[in-house]
């Protein structure tokens, strides 16, 4: 007898159902529940600020927009990647430059990154893929040497650490996703941008809401 195994499945109970009902009875706009969630995820990534959006893909677009790179700048990314990581680069009028992956870990081959760096290179957009993480210590060292920004695409990973230190400590901006098949889900979709840079956070907040920064709680 064949058994159907789904790619991703949401698991929730009465606690989650009650929380949704409570929120619906209050407001469907961004309020205290969103702020609490943003703060909890930011803490997981060792970041000061978290900004909820509709998807991890949108979080990547915001990350690139707030960094405000010149048109035509190059962003290094691994060739094994998710489509929206590449499309976010192109939508920002930037050029993706691909680096091969390690055949054992499926993560970006850090030994090949520097060969791809040019005068136009501005950032490294690197994911934690398929339950594994790249050599973030080495990536950070390369970024500092060449004065590059780091964007961590952690859509597949939530709370990863290296020697009890969050992978988020190595990035300028991290993002994660709450799509239906990811670690936790926001009823099918959702994402968050995370940073320690207040200017990045405030710019992203304006871009998220058509030029407005206000929520139901403050601002």
PLM region spans:
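N-terminal "arm"/small-domain region of PLP-dependent enzymes with the aminotransferase-like
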Residues: 1-28, 32
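Active-site region of PLP-dependent enzymes
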Residues: 29, 157-163, 170-219
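PLP-dependent aminotransferase class I/II
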Residues: 34-39, 47-50, 111, 115, ...
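PLP-dependent aminotransferase-like
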Residues: 65-154, 161
């Amino acid at each position: 007898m064949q058994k159907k195994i789904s790619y991703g499945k949401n698991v929730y109970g009465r606690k989650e159902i009650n929380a949704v009902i409570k929120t619906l009875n209050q407001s469907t706009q961004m309020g205290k529940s969103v702020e609490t969630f943003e703060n909890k995820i930011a803490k997981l990534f060792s970041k000061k600020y978290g900004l909820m959006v509709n998807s991890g893909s949108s979080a990547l677009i915001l990350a690139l927009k707030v960094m405000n790179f010149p048109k035509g700048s190059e962003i290094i990314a691994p060739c094994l990647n998710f489509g929206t990581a590449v499309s976010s680069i192109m939508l920002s009028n930037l050029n993706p430059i691909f680096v091969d992956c390690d055949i054992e870990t499926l993560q970006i081959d850090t030994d090949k990154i520097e060969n791809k760096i040019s005068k136009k290179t501005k950032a490294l957009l690197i994911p934690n893929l398929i339950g594994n993480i790249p050599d973030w210590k080495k990536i950070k060292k390369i970024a500092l040497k060449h004065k590059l920004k780091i964007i961590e695409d952690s859509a597949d990973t939530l709370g990863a650490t290296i020697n009890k230190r969050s992978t988020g400590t190595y990035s300028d901006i991290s993002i994660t996703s709450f799509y239906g098949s990811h670690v936790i889900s926001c009823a099918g979709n959702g994402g968050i941008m995370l940073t320690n840079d207040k200017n990045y956070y405030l710019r992203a907040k304006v871009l998220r809401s058509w030029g407005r920064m206000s929520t139901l709680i403050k601002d």
